């Protein structure tokens, strides 16, 4: 399937709308996220590797906020535990439609993949089945802050012994100098990937009202409050991190 170049914010906009995962974003999403999130391909592929270590037979592997299904595809490539299935859920109809197309293409290229359900829905309303792996890959930051602990508690309750939550997020930093440095370095990363200053500024204006990052310590304390016993950072590149949370 062809992948288009992200030019959504390339022209000056009189009024920058709030960012939304609509058809325009879906069309360029693979290019957008690769050029915007340092280490994204590494996180996604290794999410599958990590999941294979925690997957338990006859359980569900959840991809919450699955977008185009990159994590779901990685889970299916790496996990071989008997009786497992992947459930991918996203609230964007455009994302869900395209995700199903990508997964159908994956089915045609590989054999013996885990079965998968792709659901259009709200992860806050999801009735969890017993799960051994839950992936929240740059999803929690788009959920209302007051709902985050509730969701994590429900995930913790659904996890079976030996399972894990894998949480990837953009970080903010309480230290002003550290925050400014890593923000500037992230801007440099995006410039190096071909984004103009106009694109960077307009994307920031679009997303600042819908994405609310937390600090690493806020994530750690919230996960512990939700009932997780251990929080282990396994990846960080600039102001992006991924954590393993054990029940």
Swiss-Prot record:
Amino acids binding S-adenosyl-L-methionine: 40, 65-67, 90-91, 122-123, 137, 204
EC number: 2.1.3.-
Reactions catalysed: prephenate + S-adenosyl-L-methionine = carboxy-S-adenosyl-L-methionine + 3-phenylpyruvate + H2O
Keywords of this entry: S-adenosyl-L-methionine, Transferase
Pfam family, one: Methyltransf_25
BP GO annotations: tRNA wobble uridine modification
Domain of life according to the entry: Bacteria
Enzyme kind, highest EC tier: transferase
Family designation: Belongs to the class I-like SAM-binding methyltransferase superfamily. Cx-SAM synthase family.
Subunit structure: Homodimer.
PANTHER family, per database record: CARBOXY-S-ADENOSYL-L-METHIONINE SYNTHASE (PTHR43861:SF2), TRANS-ACONITATE 2-METHYLTRANSFERASE-RELATED (PTHR43861)
Annotated protein name in UniProt: Carboxy-S-adenosyl-L-methionine synthase
Record lineage: Bacteria, Pseudomonadati, Pseudomonadota, Gammaproteobacteria, Pseudomonadales
């Amino acid at each position: 399937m062809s992948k288009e170049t992200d030019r959504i914010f390339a022209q000056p906009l009189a009024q920058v709308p709030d960012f939304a995962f609509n058809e325009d974003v879906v069309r360029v999403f693979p290019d957008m996220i690769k050029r915007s999130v340092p280490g994204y391909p590494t996180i996604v592929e290794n999410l599958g590797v990590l999941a294979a270590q925690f997957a338990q037979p006859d359980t569900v592997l959840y991809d919450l906020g699955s977008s185009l299904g990159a994590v779901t595809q990685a889970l299916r490539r790496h996990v071989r535990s008997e009786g497992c299935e992947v459930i991918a859920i996203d609230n964007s109809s455009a994302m869900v439609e395209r995700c199903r197309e990508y997964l159908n293409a994956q089915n045609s290229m590989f054999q013996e993949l885990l079965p998968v359900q792709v659901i259009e829905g709200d992860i806050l309303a999801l009735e969890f089945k017993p799960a051994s792996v839950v992936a929240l890959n740059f999803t929690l930051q788009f959920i209302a802050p007051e709902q985050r602990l509730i969701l994590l508690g429900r995930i913790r309750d659904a996890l079976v012994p030996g399972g894990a939550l894998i949480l990837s997020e953009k970080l903010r930093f309480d230290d002003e100098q550290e925050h400014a440095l890593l923000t500037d370095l992230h801007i440099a990363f995006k410039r190096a990937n071909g984004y103009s200053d106009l694109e960077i500024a307009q994307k920031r204006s679009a997303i600042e009202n819908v994405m609310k990052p937390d600090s690493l310590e806020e994530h750690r304390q919230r996960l512990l409050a939700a009932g997780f016993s251990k929080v282990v950072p396994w990846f960080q590149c600039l102001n992006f991190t991924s954590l393993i949370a054990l029940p």
